[in-house]
UniProtKB/Swiss-Prot annotation:
The organism's taxonomic lineage, starting at the top: Eukaryota, Metazoa, Chordata, Craniata, Vertebrata
Record's protein name: Hemoglobin subunit alpha
InterPro entries per record: Globin, Globin-like_sf, Globin/Proto, Hemoglobin_a-typ, Hemoglobin_oxygen_transport, Hemoglobin_pi
Binding site for heme b: H87
Organism for this UniProt entry: Crocodylus siamensis
One Pfam family of this chain: Globin
Function, as annotated: Involved in oxygen transport from the lung to the various peripheral tissues. Has antimicrobial activity against B.subtilis ATCC 6633. Has antioxidant activity.
Gene3D superfamilies: Globins
Keyword Transport: yes
Entry GO CC: blood microparticle; haptoglobin-hemoglobin complex; hemoglobin complex
Length: 141
């Protein structure tokens, strides 16, 4: 459960991320594909090379969804319901992949905003990403 402090921390750091959704999203996906190559199986039709238009576009979608989740941090299930159904029923993404991506999101934020990612903010952002992952996997049950 996200505390009020967690929510404030997430919103504060996300303000710095919000202007870079495509750039950071693409970077997070590229990191995930490199660190967890098994995740590439969900993107057989993508050009997975560095900076590809497909990775940039999908990275922007991913970070736009996270942006939407931040904007609706008090109702993550409502904000992410459609994506949860899509990933569970249509795309059939293995739930562990959300954790892999969350790890890469944390790394990207840490690289670009090291001064903002204090231990407390890091913990809050991690809790938020875990909550998002939990909601995205809720339709699997």
């Amino acid at each position: 459960v996200l505390s009020s402090d967690d929510k404030c921390n997430v919103k504060a750091v996300w303000c710095k991320v919000a202007g870079h959704l495509e750039e950071y999203g693409a970077e997070a996906l590229e990191r995930m594909f490199c660190a967890y190559p098994q995740t590439k199986i969900y993107f057989p039709h993508f050009d997975l090379s560095h900076g590809s238009a497909q990775i940039r576009a999908h990275g922007k979608k991913v970070f736009a969804a996270l942006h939407e989740a931040v904007n609706h941090i008090d109702d993550l299930p409502g904000a992410l319901c459609r994506l949860s159904e899509l990933h569970a029923h249509s795309l059939r993404v293995d739930p562990v992949n959300f954790k892999f991506l969350a790890q890469c999101v944390l790394v990207v934020v840490a690289i670009h905003h090291p001064g903002s990612l204090t231990p407390e903010v890091h913990a809050s952002l991690d809790k938020f990403l875990c909550a998002v992952s939990s909601v995205l996997t809720s339709k699997y049950r």
